Amino acid sequence: MGSDTLDQPIFAIGTIIEDLEIIQTLSISINGQVYLAKDINTFQLYAIKSLRHIDSASLHQNFQLNEILLHSRLSGHPHVIRIERVIQNSDWTHIVIEYGSEGDLFTAIVDNNIYYGNHSLIRHVFLQLIETVRFCHSKGIYHRDLKPENILVFDRGHTLKLADFGLATADCYSKDYGCGSTFYFSPECQGGFLIDSQMGYATAPNDVWSLGVILINLSTGRNPWHIASLEDKTYCAFLRDPDLLLKMLPISSELNRIIKRIFCLDPLKRITLDELYLRVQHCIHFTRTEEVTQYESMVLKAVQLKNAQVYSKSTDDLPTPPDTPDITYSPCINQGSSSSFMGTGLLQKVALFPKMEKEI
């Protein structure tokens, strides 16, 4: 076994742990290390998630034990990453899990562009996610960190499997405010909205909110805002005008109606998973097809003209300004037209919305 410091790999390539040979280091972070391993008998590939025992009495250690326990209760579901076994020693716990060779949903959306404009595929995989989260909730488990990085892709993007239960809880209500990822957690999870000081926030509606952001990711490749907070100007603009996303992104009216039900500020009135499943099942178009085609054409022309002054930066990477402009007074919003996405300022409108990026 190699170094045992937090920022160095604990396994050298070629190390064998039980009957698994380490063949690649996949990631190293403060939360743990992930390796690719091969069974020396069957040649089957697995991922090994290694968690350091920092302090047996610490909150961190409790989260580790909780992750294994809750994930194990869900492991048999076809859309949950399977736990094969758990290997423990005095300093580390190694969770051997199913390996997804196609990577995560973030990569599929951002790098491989699998879903953009593909209505049937978006519907197919998002229904899988709803059904999987519904299964988790039926078992009394709430993920609290739903995001594309925690969803693995199989079958060339047609099958999704939920992973990483490190922040999951069995509590229907939680006072762990700020638990999750800023792009994806709900307003009430931040402790800034509708706080019940006795109970905390409801964890099931918080998961539903995260699913809504993922649905925007799948449909547009963008995040709707940096954080659902009054400090975020884009989110504040959405609170003032619930049709903002329809006017600024190439989403369909059908999707807009669903999104408004998901992003209901009151978690008790937020759409349920059962209703969400039915609405998505009957949603024909997630984006406005003609406008998407025109948008792609404009992006192509922008790339070809990237040396011109107006396209001084390649629009392959539509930048989000450091400070999002006050959208309320932006002249590019046509309050009277649901199709105001198109026309002058199209690229600038899309650029107002945060690019998808991984949170460390």
At which residue positions do the language-model features occur?
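Activation segment signature within eukaryotic-like protein kinase domains
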Residues: 125-126
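Conserved N-lobe beta3->alphaC-helix segment of eukaryotic protein kinase catalytic domains
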Residues: 51-74
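Catalytic-loop of the protein kinase fold
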Residues: 137-154
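Conserved short submotifs of the Hanks-type protein kinase catalytic core
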Residues: 90-104, 108
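Glycine-rich ATP phosphate-binding loop
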Residues: 33-38, 43-53
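Short beta-strand micro-motifs within the conserved protein kinase catalytic domain, predominantly
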Residues: 82-91
